[in-house]
Design a protein with these regions (language model features):
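Conserved structural position within tetratricopeptide repeats
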Residues: 2-3, 37, 76-77, 108-112, ...
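Short coil turns that delineate tetratricopeptide repeat
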Residues: 6, 40, 46, 80, ...
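TPR alpha-solenoid repeat register
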Residues: 11, 45, 51, 85, ...
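Canonical tetratricopeptide repeat
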Residues: 14, 54, 88, 123, ...
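Structural motif corresponding to the intra-repeat A-B loop/turn of tetratricopeptide repeats
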Residues: 22, 62, 96-97, 131, ...
Length: 202
C-alpha cells in the first residue's frame, strides 16, 4: 500500500475513493495532499489527474473554492478530457456565478462526450439559465428530464421549474417545484418559490 510504495499514486487514489464512499472528507483531503508531492513527469497522467480531481472535490466540500479550482486546473493539465472534472468545475463556477463563459465551454464539452447524461445536461442547462439564455436552457433541461425519466433527481426537477418559470410557463414551473419537494428537496428557497408562486434566487 501507500507505506510500502509511496510513489504509487494508484494506492492514494483508491484510498481516497474508499474515504469518499464513507463521506470521510477530511481523510480524503489528507490522502490527496499526501499524494501530490509524488506526482512528477514519470507519473501516469490519468491517475495524476484523478488525484487532483479528488483534491478539488475535497476542497469544494470544505467550501475552499479557490483551492478547488486550482486543483481542477491541475487535473485538466494532466487529462484535458476528464469529463467529470469538466462538469464539476463548470457547475461550481455557475453556482458562484463566476467565469460563466469558461463554465459554458467546459460544460458543452461534457454533453458532446455524453449526450444522454442527465447530470451533464442539467449543468449545461443551468449555466445557460444563469446567463439568461432561457429558451436554450429549456431545450437542455427537457433533455435532462427525459434522460432521467423514472428516476429524477430533486435538483434537476427544481432547475426545470426555475427554467420554465423564466420562460413564462408559471403553472408548469410550480408543478415542477412541487414535485422537487415531493422528491425530498428540503431547501427553504424551494419552499419559498412554492409559497410565493414565483422564482426566488438562491
Amino acid at each position: 500500500g501507500v507505506e510500502a510504495e509511496p510513489e504509487n499514486l494508484t494506492y492514494y487514489y483508491l484510498l481516497a475513493i474508499g474515504y469518499a464512499q464513507f463521506e470521510r472528507h477530511d481523510d480524503m483531503l489528507a490522502i490527496a495532499l499526501r499524494a501530490v508531492p509524488h506526482i512528477n513527469e514519470r507519473s501516469d497522467k490519468r491517475v495524476a489527474a484523478d488525484i487532483y480531481s479528488v483534491l478539488g472535490d475535497s476542497y469544494h466540500q470544505k467550501q475552499m473554492n479557490e483551492e478547488a479550482y486550482q486543483a481542477y486546473e491541475q487535473s485538466l493539465k494532466y487529462n484535458p478530457d476528464n469529463i467529470p472534472v469538466l462538469n464539476n468545475y463548470a457547475y461550481y463556477l455557475s453556482l458562484e456565478q463566476t467565469d460563466l463563459d469558461k463554465a459554458e465551454e467546459m460544460s458543452y464539452r461534457t454533453i458532446k462526450a455524453e449526450p444522454n447524461n442527465a447530470t451533464y445536461l442539467d449543468t449545461y442547462a443551468w449555466i445557460l439559465f444563469i446567463k439568461g439564455n432561457y429558451a436554450e436552457a429549456r431545450i437542455y433541461i427537457d433533455e435532462a428530464m427525459k434522460a432521467e425519466e423514472g428516476n429524477q433527481s430533486d435538483v434537476v426537477v427544481e432547475h426545470c421549474g426555475d427554467i420554465y418559470y423564466m420562460n413564462g410557463e408559471h403553472e408548469k414551473a410550480i408543478e415542477y417545484w412541487q414535485k422537487a419537494l415531493e422528491l425530498g428537496n428540503e431547501s427553504e428557497v424551494l419552499k419559498k418559490k412554492i409559497k410565493l408562486k414565483q422564482y426566488v434566487q438562491e
